[in-house]
């Protein structure tokens, strides 16, 4: 779950050709009405809507301290959770939205406190709906780029750092009461394990880490009903 099957019934768009034709006519042939400049966004459950921009300008931050969550992983050297060498850590945050849906729209961040054991290594995070296991998105980062940017920095083994991780773009609904789950590892999706292998595990400190997601509230009036096959 989490790779589009849940949106299958609303995946086919029969009006793309019309949209492309209008753009071709106006911008290449210089005739006809100017197409609307907006974004058509599909939520993870398949629902379409129109936004002026994406991420939406009216987004509001939802902040979650992972210290309020429970974690289940391998514990070594002073009780820190370790990622890498085939080990994973799962952080469960069940009681975060008991009374309302959370609609994530944008690029969430997770500022992860970590202690590398090597000048190298990486952390991969998969975020899931804690109730259903539905994949919502992922993030990955090499510890040498923990502050961002394009140039690697030397990492001192044993020194605590904050990994400024950013998820791939997400537009997803988390139903009320379902909560979030974060699975930490050193590889996932099409990201291979680091070349340094088992030598470069990363100790993570969820209790000092913070997740933040851009959220919006959208009513039924924003839903875009698209043509469907008969």
PLM region descriptions:
Residues 11-15:
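Soluble non-cytosolic domains of exported or imported proteins
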Residues 1-10:
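Catalytic cores of eukaryotic secretory-pathway lumenal/extracellular enzymes that build
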Residues 16-18, 25-230:
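Glycine/threonine-rich phosphate-binding loop and adjacent beta-strand/alpha-helix elements that clamp
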């Amino acid at each position: 779950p989490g790779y589009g099957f849940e949106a299958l019934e609303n995946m086919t768009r029969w009006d793309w050709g019309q949209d492309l034709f209008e753009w071709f006519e106006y911008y290449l042939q210089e005739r006809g009405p100017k197409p609307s400049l907006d974004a058509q966004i599909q939520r993870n459950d398949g629902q379409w809507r129109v936004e002026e921009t994406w991420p939406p300008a009216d987004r509001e931050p939802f902040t979650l301290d992972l210290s309020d969550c429970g974690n289940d992983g391998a514990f070594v050297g002073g009780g820190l959770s370790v990622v890498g060498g085939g080990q994973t850590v799962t952080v469960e945050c069940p009681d975060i939205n008991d009374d309302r849906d959370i609609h994530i729209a944008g690029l969430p961040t997770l500022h992860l406190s970590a202690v590398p054991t090597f000048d190298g290594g990486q952390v991969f995070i998969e975020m899931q709906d804690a109730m259903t296991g539905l994949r919502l998105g992922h993030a990955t980062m090499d510890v040498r780029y923990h502050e961002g940017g394009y140039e690697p920095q030397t990492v001192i083994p044993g020194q605590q750092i904050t990994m400024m991780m950013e998820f791939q773009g997400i537009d997803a609904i988390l139903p009320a009461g379902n909560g979030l789950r974060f699975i930490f590892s050193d590889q996932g999706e099409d990201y291979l394990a680091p070349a340094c292998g088992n030598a470069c595990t990363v100790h993570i400190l969820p209790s000092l880490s913070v997740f933040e997601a851009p959220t919006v509230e959208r009513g039924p009036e924003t839903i875009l009903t698209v043509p469907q096959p008969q």
